[in-house]
C-alpha cells in the first residue's frame, strides 16, 4: 500500500499568472511533482490548449494518472534538463507559449523517509530523484575522497565546515558505512560547534549531497538554455528557486540574455545589432511568498519566483 503525502504547490497563483496563459497555448510543466501547477494551468487552458509535463520521479509519473482522461495533458518520464529534446521530438520547437520550472524537492519526497531526502526522518540514504537508476547517497559517501566530499559540501551546500565534516565522515565510515539518514544527521549535529539558529546542522550537507547525486545544477542550466530554444516569441518562463545557488543561476541567466551579446570596446556595431541579440526580458521583480502562504506552508519560506519573456528571434 502506497502512503500518501500532501503537497502544497508554492507560489501557485503567481507562477501560473506569470505564464500569461493563452486558452489555445502550448505549455511545459518541467517539474510535475504531484501536479499542483499542472492542475492550475489546465484550469486556465481552453479545450484546444495543451500541457506537456516532465518529471524523473517514478512516483510523480504515477501521480499523473489523475489527468489520464484529459486529452490536453501528457507526461514525459525524464529530467527537465532534456526538455528541449522532448519538445523537438514532438515537433514543437519555437512553438511553446510558456515553460514552468519549480526546483524544489516536493513535500512527498521529503516526507517519505524511504526516499532518504530528510535529516528529520530516518530512512535509507538514497536521495535519488529517480530511484530506479544512478548511485545512492550511501554509495557515494562510502567511496568519495575527503577532498571530493569537502568540495561538494562547500560548493553545493555553502557549508563553512566542509573539510571538518568530510574528515569526520571518512573516519566514521572506517568503523561502519553510513546507510541511514539519521546516522549522517546525528554525526553532523554532534561535530558542529557553531550551530545556525532555526536551522538543523545537517541542512547544508544534505542539500549538497542531493544536488550532487542528481546533477541538479547541470539540469537547471540545461533546462534554462532549453527553454530559450523552445519558447515562441513572447512566450513566458516562470521559475521557482529555493536556495541561493539556484536563484543566482536563474537571475544571471535572465540578465545575460536580456543584455544581448557583449561587444569588445571599439568594435563598429550598432545599438540595433545589439538589440537583435537580446533573447529575453525580465517581467517585474522577483516574487516571494506572502506571510499568509508561509504560515500555511513553511516550506515556501525560501522560495523565489522570477519571470521572463522571450523576445522575437533574430531576423
UniProtKB/Swiss-Prot annotation:
Its name, as the record gives it, is Ribosomal RNA small subunit methyltransferase H
Arranged from A to Z, the UniProt key words for this protein are:
Cytoplasm, Methyltransferase, rRNA processing, S-adenosyl-L-methionine, Transferase
Task: Report the family membership.
Answer: Belongs to the methyltransferase superfamily. RsmH family.
Among the GO biological process terms of this entry, one is: rRNA base methylation
Q: What does this protein do?
A: Specifically methylates the N4 position of cytidine in position 1402 (C1402) of 16S rRNA.
Q: Which organism is it from?
A: Shewanella halifaxensis (strain HAW-EB4)
Report disulfide bridges, numbered on this chain.
none
**From which domain of life does this come?**
Bacteria
Amino acid at each position: 500500500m502506497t502512503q500518501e503525502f500532501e503537497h502544497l504547490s508554492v507560489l501557485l497563483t503567481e507562477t501560473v499568472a506569470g505564464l500569461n496563459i493563452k486558452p489555445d497555448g502550448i505549455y511545459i510543466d518541467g517539474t510535475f511533482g504531484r501536479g499542483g501547477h499542472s492542475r492550475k494551468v489546465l484550469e486556465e487552458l481552453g479545450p484546444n490548449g495543451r500541457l506537456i509535463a516532465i518529471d524523473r520521479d517514478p512516483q510523480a509519473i504515477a501521480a499523473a494518472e489523475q489527468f489520464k482522461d484529459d486529452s490536453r495533458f501528457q507526461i514525459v518520464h525524464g529530467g527537465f534538463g532534456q526538455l528541449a529534446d522532448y519538445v523537438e521530438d514532438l515537433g514543437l520547437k519555437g512553438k511553446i507559449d510558456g515553460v514552468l520550472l519549480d526546483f524544489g524537492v516536493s513535500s512527498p519526497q521529503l516526507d517519505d523517509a524511504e526516499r532518504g531526502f530528510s535529516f528529520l526522518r530516518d530512512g535509507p540514504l538514497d536521495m535519488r530523484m529517480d530511484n530506479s537508476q544512478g548511485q545512492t547517497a550511501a554509495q557515494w559517501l562510502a567511496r568519495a575522497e575527503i577532498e571530493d566530499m569537502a568540495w561538494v559540501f562547500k560548493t553545493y551546500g555553502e557549508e563553512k565546515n566542509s573539510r571538518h565534516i568530510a574528515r569526520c565522515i571518512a573516519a566514521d565510515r572506517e568503523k561502519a558505512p553510513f546507510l541511514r539518514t539519521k546516522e549522517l544527521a546525528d554525526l553532523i549535529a554532534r561535530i558542529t560547534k557553531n550551530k545556525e539558529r532555526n536551522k538543523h546542522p545537517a541542512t547544508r550537507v544534505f542539500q549538497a549531497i542531493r544536488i550532487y547525486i542528481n546533477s541538479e545544477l547541470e539540469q537547471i542550466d540545461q533546462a534554462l538554455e532549453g527553454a530559450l530554444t523552445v519558447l515562441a516569441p513572447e512566450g513566458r518562463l516562470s521559475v521557482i528557486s529555493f536556495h541561493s545557488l539556484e536563484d543566482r543561476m536563474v537571475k544571471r541567466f535572465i540578465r545575460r540574455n536580456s543584455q544581448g551579446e557583449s561587444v569588445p570596446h571599439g568594435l563598429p556595431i550598432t545599438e540595433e545589432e545589439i538589440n537583435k541579440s537580446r533573447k529575453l526580458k525580465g517581467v517585474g521583480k522577483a516574487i516571494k511568498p506572502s506571510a499568509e502562504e508561509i504560515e500555511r506552508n513553511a516550506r515556501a519560506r525560501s522560495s523565489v519566483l522570477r519571470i521572463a519573456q522571450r523576445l522575437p528571434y533574430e531576423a
